[in-house]
């Protein structure tokens, strides 16, 4: 199973980070951050569907998507061409991301008014704190890899630190867990993380089950304006698009076509 392998492959890296920067010291550094996180929920509300544009170099299914990968340059293009938030993949082994990419984007100022979402396989409170330290305003939490108790723990900690959570589901049972945890931003992942197969009808099936007070984000497999129009008709608030953008020769032109 791909999801399980990704989590396992990253455990040694997490332990090394804990050794280099113990939790107590990490917590001190986070408390000293002078500026509050940008509210991603506010950025995703509106009449028109919003775009979360993803900084993504590679994936397990496609390999390297963009050889000439410059995360700061890509984030700047996103910020100038209508993105409402920027997702930054930080998983190293399968997506070739890094926490340093997140930090570089935040410190560069190219997207100073947009929330940054750390997209990774987060399962430990340590990762929540380090997300804030490296400049994240929000984090991804994947229900498929978390117990209900751990999901609630990570949600509570994130909110304590002022960060929003995109809580990702793929099935009805996962959606029920997310709603029971009082998640307010629900990500409907059209990709099965166990097989990496895409099915856009996932959003179609699950969207009607989500109460109106939640913000709904459709993720994965979104390639064209027609895809977005279809999802907009289903009542989603935002779409998360990565591969279709970073694989484009002209990212700005692709964004204009999508929006």
Swiss-Prot record:
GO terms for molecular function: indole-3-glycerol-phosphate synthase activity; phosphoribosylanthranilate isomerase activity. It catalyses: 1-(2-carboxyphenylamino)-1-deoxy-D-ribulose 5-phosphate + H(+) = (1S,2R)-1-C-(indol-3-yl)glycerol 3-phosphate + CO2 + H2O. Its EC number is 4.1.1.48. This is Indole-3-glycerol phosphate synthase. It comes from the Bacteria. InterPro entries: Aldolase_TIM, Indole-3-glycerol_P_synth, Indole-3-glycerol_P_synth_dom, Indole-3-GlycerolPSynthase_CS, RibuloseP-bd_barrel. Keywords: Amino-acid biosynthesis, Aromatic amino acid biosynthesis, Decarboxylase, Lyase, Tryptophan biosynthesis. Belongs to the TrpC family. GO terms for biological process: L-tryptophan biosynthetic process. It holds the Pfam family IGPS.
């Amino acid at each position: 199973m791909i999801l399980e392998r990704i989590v396992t492959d990253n455990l040694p890296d997490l332990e090394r980070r804990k050794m280099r920067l113990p939790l107590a010291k990490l917590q001190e550094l986070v408390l000293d951050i002078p500026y509050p996180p940008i509210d991603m929920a506010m950025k995703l509300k509106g009449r028109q569907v919003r775009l979360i544009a993803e900084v993504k170099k590679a994936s397990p299914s496609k390999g390297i998507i963009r050889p000439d990968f410059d995360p700061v340059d890509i984030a700047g293009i996103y910020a100038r061409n209508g993105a409402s938030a920027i997702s930054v993949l930080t998983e190293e082994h399968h997506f070739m991301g890094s926490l340093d990419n997140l930090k570089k984007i935040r410190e560069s100022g190219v997207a100073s008014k947009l929330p940054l979402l750390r997209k990774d396989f987060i399962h430990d409170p340590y990762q929540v704190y380090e997300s804030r330290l490296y400049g994240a305003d929000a984090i991804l939490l994947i229900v498929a890899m978390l117990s209900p108790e751990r999901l609630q723990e990570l949600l509570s900690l994130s909110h304590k630190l002022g960060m929003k959570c995109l809580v990702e589901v793929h099935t009805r049972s996962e959606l029920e867990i997310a709603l029971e945890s009082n998640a307010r931003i629900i990500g409907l992942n059209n990709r099965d993380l166990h097989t990496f197969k895409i099915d856009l009808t996932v959003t179609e099936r699950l969207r009607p089950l989500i109460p109106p007070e939640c913000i709904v984000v459709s993720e994965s497999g979104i390639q064209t304006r027609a895809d977005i129009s279809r999802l907009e008709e289903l009542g989603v608030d935002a779409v998360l698009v990565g591969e279709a953008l970073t694989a484009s020769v002209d990212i700005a032109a692709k964004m204009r076509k999508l929006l």
